[in-house]
Amino acid sequence: MTAIQLIVGLGNPGAEYEQTRHNAGAFFVERIAAAQRVDLVPERKFFGLTGRFTHQGQDVRLLIPTTYMNRSGQAVAALAGFYRIPVESILVAHDELDLPPGVAKLKVGGGHGGHNGLRDIIAQLGNQNTFHRLRLGIGHPGDASKVSGFVLGRAPRAEQEKLDASIDFALGVLPDIFAGEWNRAMKNLHSQKA
């Protein structure tokens, strides 16, 4: 596996979206930044908050796009292009309707599954979809017409605690991810459930 050089956390900017389910990916990157004692600072040319740390001699960049979700690819393409980061070296953390709260899954490649952030990233990367994904379960409202309000809403406390636990599980497999042990990371993460 190619070493991960960029970890992207998807979300929407602004106080009104700060604690919503759609910002699950941003929560993950914020937690990495805190653990690594990295400040996430605004970078206009990358359309987001960025940070950097070194893991065993390898630079790892963090990005939370400050564009709206459906323009996330603008930020990812700008940063990846500037630092010449291959698509295969990108990990995108995002909310996942098809998984219940408390479950996180790793995946390589695939479609966007209706997720507008992933859709734009794939488009902005020249229709390349071979980046890695961390899918953070938020559950589904049960009716497709309720999805928008659901993802842009705040989770009840018990649900948020499960999401936080799934982020903890994902943080726990980062050493395997950085070591290129993708299968071990998947096995360990996929056996966890809050």
Curated annotation (Swiss-Prot):
Superkingdom, taxonomy of origin: Bacteria
Main location: cytoplasm
Catalytic reactions of this protein: an N-acyl-L-alpha-aminoacyl-tRNA + H2O = an N-acyl-L-amino acid + a tRNA + H(+)
E.C. numbers: 3.1.1.29
UniProt enzyme class: hydrolase
Binding site for tRNA: 17, 68, 70, 116
Active-site feature positions: 22 (proton acceptor)
Keyword tRNA-binding: yes
Biological process, per Gene Ontology: protein quality control for misfolded or incompletely synthesized proteins; rescue of stalled ribosome
GO molecular function terms attached to this record: peptidyl-tRNA hydrolase activity; tRNA binding
Site positions for Stabilizes the basic form of H active site to accept a proton: 95
GO annotation, cellular component aspect: cytoplasm
Alphabetical list of InterPro entries matching this protein: Pept_tRNA_hydro, Pept_tRNA_hydro_CS, Pept_tRNA_hydro_sf
Assembly with partners or alone: Monomer.
Similarity remark: Belongs to the PTH family.
Protein name: Peptidyl-tRNA hydrolase
Organism: Pseudomonas syringae pv. syringae (strain B728a)
